C-alpha cells in the first residue's frame, strides 16, 4: 500500500471491520518531518479489521509515534484489546506490582508514585524489551504533563559517518538500577515505595548501541536512561559516560522530537524499538495518570545480526519472546 501520509495535506483511509462492523475513514496528519502523526476518526474501542491494523503498523513504521484523538477508549479492557492487535501483551512491569488494577497487563503511570522525566526506552534492562507501548489518558492535570517522543533512527542517521561506524561496534549494559529511579526529589512514601520495588530484583542485559529494526531495517541508537552512566563494553567508565552523552544529545535534538499534549480519550502508540520518550514534570504534581500497556518484543540485534544477551535477571514471567 502506498503511504501518502507524509504530504502536507490530511490523508484518509477507509476500511471495513470484522463481523460486519464498519470502521469509517480516518485521517492522518503528520506532526513533524521526522516523527509523529495524528489520527482522527478511528474508534479504537471496537475490533479492528486486519487491513486497518496493517495500515496502523505501516504508519507506525513511518512516523514512529501515532497520536489517536477521540478514540472511544474508556476502559483498560478496550485498551488491551487494541494493543493485542499487534502481538501478545507483557505483564505490567518486571519488578513493580500494583494493586487495584483491572488487569496484570496495566501499568499506571501515576504522578502519585513516579515521575518519568528521564529520556528512556521502556524496560530495556530485559533481554526482549517491548516492541510497542500504548499510553491512554485517564486523569489529566489542568496544565502541563506533556510527553516528548524522539526518533532514534533519525538521530543515528544524523551522526557523522565515522561516528556511526564506531557506534555500530559498541554494546551497552542496561540495568534497572539507573538514574531513571533516582529523581531529583522524592515527595511521598508512594514514590519511595515505587523506587524500592523497581530495583527489588536486579536486571542487567547487554544490548547493541545501534539496533536494527526487524520490520523496517532502519538502524537506531538504542540507549537511554537504563544505559546511562553504565559501562560500555571495551572502554573505561569515564569514556563510556562521555560517549553516551554525545550519542544521547543526538537522540534528543528538537528536530527529532514530537511533543504530545494530552487530551481526554487520547491514546499514543509508539514504537519502543526505535524511540525514546520523556514525561515533562511541569504540572506542579497535580493528579496525572496514564495507563500503559505494552506488546511483547523480540531480542535486539546489531548490524551484524548479533543478538543481545542477559547478564542478570530472568524476565520470562514478564514477557514472552516473539520473533519479528
Set out the residue ranges of the language-model regions:
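Non-heme Fe(II) oxygenase catalytic core, chiefly the N-lobe of the double-stranded beta-helix
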Residues: 2-267, 273-324
Amino acid at each position: 500500500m502506498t503511504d501518502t501520509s507524509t504530504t502536507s495535506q490530511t490523508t484518509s483511509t477507509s476500511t471495513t471491520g470484522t463481523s460486519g462492523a464498519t470502521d469509517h475513514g480516518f485521517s492522518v496528519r503528520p506532526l513533524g518531518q521526522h516523527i509523529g502523526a495524528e489520527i482522527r476518526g478511528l474508534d479504537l474501542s471496537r475490533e479492528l479489521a486486519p487491513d486497518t491494523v496493517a495500515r496502523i503498523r505501516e504508519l507506525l513504521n513511518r512516523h514512529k509515534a501515532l497520536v489517536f484523538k477521540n478514540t472511544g477508549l474508556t476502559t483498560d479492557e478496550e485498551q488491551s484489546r487494541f494493543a493485542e492487535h499487534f502481538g501478545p501483551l507483557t505483564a505490567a512491569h518486571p519488578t513493580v506490582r500494583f494493586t487495584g488494577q483491572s488487569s496484570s497487563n496495566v501499568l499506571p503511570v501515576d504522578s502519585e508514585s513516579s515521575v518519568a522525566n528521564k529520556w528512556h526506552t521502556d524496560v530495556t534492562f530485559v533481554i526482549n524489551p517491548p516492541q510497542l507501548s500504548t499510553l491512554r489518558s485517564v486523569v489529566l492535570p489542568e496544565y502541563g504533563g506533556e510527553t516528548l517522543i524522539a526518533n532514534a533512527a533519525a538521530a543515528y542517521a544524523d551522526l557523522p559517518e565515522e561516528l556511526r561506524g564506531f557506534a555500530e561496534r559498541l554494546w551497552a549494559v542496561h540495568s534497572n538500577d539507573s538514574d531513571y529511579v533516582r529523581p531529583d526529589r522524592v515527595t511521598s512514601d508512594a514514590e519511595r515505595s515505587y523506587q524500592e520495588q523497581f530495583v527489588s530484583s536486579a536486571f542487567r542485559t547487554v544490548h547493541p548501541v545501534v539496533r536494527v529494526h526487524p520490520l523496517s531495517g532502519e538502524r537506531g541508537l538504542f540507549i537511554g536512561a537504563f544505559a546511562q552512566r553504565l559501562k560500555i563494553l571495551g572502554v573505561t567508565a569515564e569514556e563510556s559516560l562521555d560517549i553516551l552523552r554525545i550519542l544521547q544529545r543526538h537522540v534528543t535534538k528538537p528536530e527529532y522530537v514530537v511533543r504530545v499534549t494530552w487530551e481526554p480519550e487520547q491514546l499514543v502508540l509508539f514504537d519502543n524499538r526505535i524511540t525514546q520518550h520523556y514525561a515533562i514534570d511541569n504540572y506542579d504534581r497535580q493528579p496525572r495518570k496514564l495507563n500503559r500497556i505494552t506488546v511483547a518484543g523480540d531480542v535486539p540485534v546489531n548490524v551484524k545480526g548479533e543478538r543481545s544477551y542477559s547478564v542478570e535477571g530472568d524476565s520470562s514471567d514478564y514477557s514472552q519472546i516473539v520473533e519479528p
